[in-house]
Amino acid sequence: MRLVRAAGLTMTVLALAGAAAPPGIVGSGAVAVAFRMSDPRITESSGLAISRSRPGLAYTVNDSGDGPYVYAIDMGTGAVVGVTALAGVEAVDFEAMGTGPDATLLVADIGDNDADRDVVRVHVIDEPRRGSVAVEPRSVELTYPDGPHDAEAVLTVGDRLVVVTKEFVGAGFYAAPVFTEDSGTAFVLRRVGDAPAVVTDATVLDDGRVVVRDYGRGYVVRPDGWRQVGRFRLPRMPQGETIAAADIGQVVYAGSEGTDSAVYRLRVPGPGADGETGRRPGERSTAASGHTDVPAATPPSTPPSTGSGTAQLAPWLMAGGVLALIAAAAAVRRRRW
């Protein structure tokens, strides 16, 4: 992913902060490597989806720099068993995938690091089979009501396509009725809720709950009001970019960019595991709320930290310091102009 310097530095610090979770997030639960994307063609897996109609297949796309290709992955071996080319499509910045109605697949060209794309696109195709083929997708043009946004997450809720923007402040869920019977090809998105900061992917569980992720955690959200009802820690990854729900059950697969990247399988805590306090994403929990973070999922090789309170807080203090430096630098630059 191509990031501006300041954002890249900030995300690096936030990732370090996430490596030592604050008190209240306790590591437990089984996590396993489901498969590895070892094919040399997959270098920047930025989207992941699990097939609903073809058992044992997953799909991924590369970040910007590759062509308009969808790779079918055998989940038993991690091998690429099919490549689907999207005919007539220019891949600007593929950043997300999702599953749609009637065994369709969403390929979201919604990345916009510089926030200068007036229109972004989501391409809809039938879930590919094994083998190589070229298909002509249904391409949907999307416009934000409040100007361009960077985004790396797409999902469907009922007949609505939902995009989750990737921002440090003011991130949101934006929706459009893309899958109604009289659907067109161009839509103005509507903001329907607030999202956590720096979301890199999202998915929908079979019970209807939405799971979004950042570089270190997953957040459980109810789409009837877009309220955050839980969170859990994700396995440590070089650059965690993907999350996809299994075809059945409360299981998700989480992956990273990079060559030979591992895809982890983990279970999402069930409804009520944290009291379902109804907090909206970004709201702080308090003792009065009764909120308790859901049990975290961590790899067996990386047990949760048992260090002192000072050690637990150190990464967060470092993150705050770097953010302050970035803000100061920006202020100096404005004065020069």
Give names to the regions the model predicted:
Residues 2-9, 18-337:
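Sequence/structural signature of beta-propeller domains
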